[in-house]
Curated annotation (Swiss-Prot):
Binds 1 Mg(2+) ion per subunit. It comes from the Bacteria. In the N-terminal section; belongs to the N-acetylglucosamine-1-phosphate uridyltransferase family. In the C-terminal section; belongs to the transferase hexapeptide repeat family. Keywords: Acyltransferase, Cell shape, Cell wall biogenesis/degradation, Cytoplasm, Magnesium, Metal-binding, Multifunctional enzyme, Nucleotidyltransferase, Peptidoglycan synthesis, Repeat, Transferase. This is Bifunctional protein GlmU. GO terms for molecular function: glucosamine-1-phosphate N-acetyltransferase activity; magnesium ion binding; UDP-N-acetylglucosamine diphosphorylase activity.
């Protein structure tokens, strides 16, 4: 029989105190909704339905083309939310997973185990449960003397005995699809919240003598639902530990995994060394045997093998193998540093291609430039690429030597093996094999300094 899935993503998330829908807050680089969707994908649902409501279009954009959607215009409880999916799933043979979109720590493995347990035990409903040291706020799993699940009691409706139970409802279930929608027609709002509880269908199944089971998570952390910023930070912490552990198992060295922040889609090859306080975001890739030192921050970039990035920021760029960057360099979007490039102290590169083995050691700005191989930039070089309205390109050919404090006024071309003298302002193209000097000639005024206040003769 087929698997189906319903993801509940309609809530406002009032306790988040945010204009953003709760399920769109991010954990380790992707939204909570995406984490849940990826976990659900492991069970290979024949159809996935996402229930949306608050700021529905924002939520729809995240899974557009990957899920069917249904609207819950009024938030009248979890049971009501699942009712909204009936049009998409009614009459289908199989089992349906129901899961909240604010549970980013759930794993696909656990959901697969839940489905298998449900099918193997021929249950009409199976509850995913966990054991909590402090169960306050959770619905409790109530069992009879034979260990069978009889009902789920919400915190506000639980008596003193029921409040002592530590087995809690995670809010994730598997149901026989047809029986789910049949039972939903018989639930009501006669409870402390005045809502349609999805959990009431469990009591209906039990009253009909149908089999209800529970599968317990091995790891309570997977059950975490995020309702506020405190829980969001907890989820981030758990996810960070998982991600870093996986990379370490796969051969990456961490100086301090508790102070290293890596998004879930980052790829790192073996034998990379990562020092403390490094952040890798988005879809960054890091090649083998590279070293990322303390304070490095990389976003959506590809870093080649055997590179060394020292306390620098790289955004939406490519750094090829054997390059060195930093310390305190900034590689801005749409840049490419080719093999063996050295970008040093306080150098900024933006929207530029830097050829093989080119060096810009310190205090340089390279913007909107195409630079050949084996070029040397002296300290203080500036490509002047913006006139207040438009950006212009600088082209520097192979083996050029750019003297310290050169100002290159784009648009500009500097030929192969050309040299610009230190301190020059270059406004015209420089032919290959030429020296360009664009500065005033020095004039010495002998004896003039005697009249200046700093001169010893002027001191009293």
């Amino acid at each position: 029989m087929s698997n189906y899935a319903i993801i509940l993503a309609a809530g406002k998330g009032t306790r988040m105190k945010s204009d953003l829908p709760k399920v769109l807050h991010k954990v380790s680089g992707i939204t909570m909704l995406e984490h849940v969707f990826r976990a659900v994908s492991v069970i290979e649902p024949a159809k996935n339905v996402t229930v949306i409501g608050h700021k529905a279009e924002l939520v729809r954009e995240v899974l557009d083309g990957q899920s069917a959607f249904t609207m819950q215009t009024e938030q009248l409880g979890t049971g009501h939310a699942v009712m909204m999916a009936e049009e998409e799933l009614a009459g289908l043979e199989g089992q349906t997973l129901v899961i909240a979109g604010d549970t980013p720590l759930i794993t696909g493995e656990s959901l697969k185990n839940l489905i298998d347990f449900h099918v193997n035990h021929k249950n009409v409903a199976t509850i995913l449960t966990a054991t909590a040291d402090n169960p306050f706020g959770y619905g409790r799993i109530i069992r009879n003397e034979n260990g069978e699940v009889t009902k789920i009691v919400e915190q506000k409706d639980a008596n003193k005995f029921e409040q002592q139970v530590k087995e809690i409802n995670t809010g994730t279930y598997v149901f026989d699809n047809k029986r789910l929608f049949e039972a939903l027609k018989n639930i009501n709002t006669n409870n402390a919240q005045g809502e349609y509880y999805l959990t009431d269908v469990i009591s209906i199944f039990r009253e009909n003598g149908e089999k209800v089971g529970a599968y317990t998570l091995r790891d309570f952390e997977e059950s975490l639902g995020v309702n506020d910023r405190v829980a969001l930070a907890t989820a981030e912490d758990v996810m960070r530990r998982r991600i870093n552990k996986t990379h370490m198992i796969n051969g990456v060295t961490f100086q301090n995994p508790n102070a290293t922040y890596i998004d879930v889609d980052v790829e790192i090859a073996p034998d990379v060394v990562i020092e403390a306080n490094v952040t890798l975001k988005g879809k960054t890739k890091v090649g083998a045997e590279s070293v990322l030192t303390n304070g490095t921050y990389i976003v959506d970039s590809t870093i080649g093998a055997n590179t060394v990035i020292t306390n620098s920021m790289i955004e939406h760029s490519v750094v090829e193998k054997g390059a060195t960057v930093g310390p305190f360099a900034h590689i801005r979007p749409d840049s490419m540093l080719k093999e063996g490039v050295h970008i040093g102290n306080f150098v900024e590169v933006k929207g530029s291609t830097i050829g093989e083995n080119t060096k810009a050691g310190h205090l340089t700005y390279i913007g909107n430039a195409e630079v050949g191989s084996d070029v040397n930039f002296g300290a203080g070089t500036i490509t002047v690429n913006y006139d207040g309205q438009h950006k212009f390109k600088t082209q520097i050919a192979n083996n050029a030597f750019i003297g310290s404090n050169s100002t290159l006024i784009a648009p500009l071309e500097i030929g192969d093996n050309a040299l610009t003298a230190a301190g020059s302002t270059i406004t015209d193209n420089v032919p290959a094999d030429s020296v360009a000097i664009g500065r005033s000639r020095q004039v010495n005024k002998e004896g003039y300094a005697i009249k200046k206040p700093h001169h010893p003769s002027q001191q009293k």
